[in-house]
Amino acid sequence: EPEKEIIREKPEGTNYDFRDPKAIKIGEKYYIVLGACVDEKGTFLLYESEDAENWKYRCPLITEETRIRTIECPDFFPLDDKYVAMGAWMSHYDEYGRFQQCRYYVGDWNGDAMDVHTQQWVDFGSNCYAAQSFQHEDRRILIGWISDFYGEHIATEPGAYGSMTLPRELHVKNEHVYTKPVEEVYTLLGDTVYEGTGREIKVGSIADNRYYASVSFEETGDFNILLGQDGDKSISLTAEGGKVFFKMAGVKSDKVQFVSSVEKCRNAEIFVDGRTIEVYLNDGEDVG
């Protein structure tokens, strides 16, 4: 059948950035959130329908006051007695030099504009963009696009551009989004190469640069974990001066600060898969 245009209406002041519809059914109604720029502000636009065929514009769900080009790839869903919106901030650098991240918003919603209580980055690392979630049985699962905004990917023939994060299960606790790998990820683990305790641990090289590590700290002080190294290029997970962050060396993003919202790290789960590293802090309090 021919494609059917279902949304033409958009609020006055909306420019050509008008994209990426995400549909969801809440109660007996259907809703679509669209990413847009309205009056030079990144905006989540909310549409509603009784039958998923005939749509009308409702209102701005969220208007972001920070100067960004537009909201891309918005998402919106109920979770743990709260509502969560997510959107990718296009052409934005934060105070640490990170480029184009995803933002989440947690709050209440009664059908009009969302009453936002808290907001934070979806991921404190690099290149997690256009994150989208879906409902699988009783789980809300998120997958992000690992892009290459810093131009660090070394392509090989036949080559590919970008990859995806691990599937992440979401929950809201204390009005913040907690993120953990879905339980199925752990079925991929192989043999244990080291298990023990100590302040200085050297494991050595690991075949194919693929490994999982679970680390717990008796004290929430400073530490440094070398996650990977290739000559003068390296990446570490570091706690120093009340901040937890990725420390980069010898790569194009080594001047960028990838700082977590976590101030005191009690534990970390580390997944390394070739060119990708994912770290989950404090049982899902933050991820990068």
Regions found by a protein language model. Name each.
Residues 1, 48-52, 107:
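Conserved Ser/Thr-centered positions that define the repeating blades of beta-propeller domains
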Residues 75, 79-92, 100-106:
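Loop/turn-rich, solvent-exposed surfaces of beta-rich toroidal or solenoidal domains
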Residues 108-288:
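Beta-rich accessory regions
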